[in-house]
A protein has these predicted regions:
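N-terminal small-domain helix-loop-helix segment of the aminotransferase-like
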Residues: 2-96, 289-292
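Conserved G/P- and acidic residue-centered "switch" motifs that form tight phosphate/ATP-binding loops
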Residues: 180, 208, 243
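A short helix->loop->beta-strand "cap" motif at the edges of active sites that frequently abuts
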Residues: 134, 200-203, 232-233
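Conserved small/polar residues in nucleotide/adenosyl-binding loops
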Residues: 323-329
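Conserved core of the PLP fold type I
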Residues: 61-196, 214, 221-226
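Hydrophobic "anchor" residues on beta-strands that sit immediately upstream
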Residues: 114, 172, 204-205, 236
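PLP-dependent aminotransferase class I/II
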Residues: 234-316
């Protein structure tokens, strides 16, 4: 069993790194702590590095079409880590989850239609809706401080959720599961309630589950499409190795759509963009990550939990009160 050194400090400045170099270009101090972007300062797993080295040494980076090994790595990962049995034909590749969100908005709504989100949420949700001339409708999450427990909790206002769907004739809901940035890991019961409402009103759900592998002990990620077979029929599930394995710059994501009609509509929008084959090295890294990255991820999550516990204790001492969340958003 390999032991990974997450204490190693790697200087990313001056490497065209968006996280650090962008801040300096915008006039921020050179020593600024860039907490605004979700990539990590850890090197990737040995399995990924070795696979990329082999691909680079081959010396040709032509058009790429992943085969069975790629799809098997992904489906096996989903079954092992998320108790979700999937099929190869459900998987559609895009260069990123935000790209997929845009394709879904165009595939399943028309200009002027309303799209439902749950603020406070990852800001590209709003941008991608407005940039495609759709209307943003907000089912704002309800925030509750539990002072005696030193915790905070966001919850869903289901009455408002259904009311907005009816009043605004919602056709598409973009779910963030787990929720970024509030860190809620939605329970099966919460997702069941959302799903029943969407089923009742024929609302398509696009579930952004890119943070599905970052859940703290005591919590369990539930794939929305796996809550109920009926929900799978109207769900687009967005996943990627980018957050889990620190691969954002390799531009690859895997979108699961079990309903053939939805899949064809989504593919039509992808075709309109001219996107076809994935990034050659991105495909290699994705397969390697899902095939052999479990040990690295297990050690990473333990390390991140130690960081969280340190930060919690430090802020509790200095600020006297701290509210924590379920996931590492």
């Amino acid at each position: 069993m390999a032991t990974y050194n997450f204490d190693k400090i790697i200087n990313r400045k001056g490497t065209n790194c968006l996280k650090y170099d962008y801040a300096v270009e915008r006039g921020k101090p050179a020593d600024v702590l860039p907490l605004w972007v979700a990539d990590m300062d850890f090197t990737v797993s040995e399995e990924i590095t070795k696979s990329l080295h082999a691909a680079v040494d081959h010396g040709i980076y032509g058009y790429t079409q992943p085969k069975d090994a790629y799809y098997n790595a992904i489906t096996n990962w989903m079954e092992k880590n998320h108790n979700w049995k999937t099929k190869r034909e459900w998987i559609m590749k895009t260069p990123g989850v935000v790209f997929a969100l845009g394709a879904a908005v165009k595939a399943f709504t028309k200009p002027g239609d309303a799209v439902l989100i749950q603020n406070p949420v990852y800001y590209p949700f709003t941008n991608i809706i407005r940039d495609n001339d759709r209307r943003v409708i907000d089912n704002t999450l309800v925030y509750e401080k539990r002072v005696t427990e030193g915790k905070s909790q966001y919850s869903i206002d289901y009455e408002d959720f259904e009311r907005k769907i009816v009043q605004e004739h919602i056709k598409l809901f973009i779910l963030c599961n787990p929720h970024n940035p509030v860190g809620r890991v939605w329970t099966r019961e919460e997702l069941q309630q959302l799903g029943e409402i969407c089923l009742r009103h024929h609302v398509i759900v696009v579930s952004d589950e890119i943070h599905n592998d970052f859940v703290y002990p005591g919590f369990e990620h539930t794939v929305f499409a796996n809550v109920d077979p009926r929900f799978a029929e109207f769900t687009v599930t967005c996943t990627a190795p980018s957050k889990t394995f620190n691969l954002a710059g390799l531009q690859i994501s895997n979108i699961f759509i079990s309903n053939e009609t939805l899949r064809e509509a989504f593919q039509k929008e992808i075709d309109k963009t001219g996107y076809d084959e994935p990034n050659a090295l991105g495909a290699v890294a994705c397969e390697a990550a899902y095939r052999g990255g479990q040990e690295w991820l297990d050690q990473l999550r333990a390390y991140l939990l130690e960081n969280l516990n340190f930060l919690r204790a430090y802020l509790q001492e200095k600020l006297c009160l701290l509210y924590t969340s379920d996931a590492a958003d």
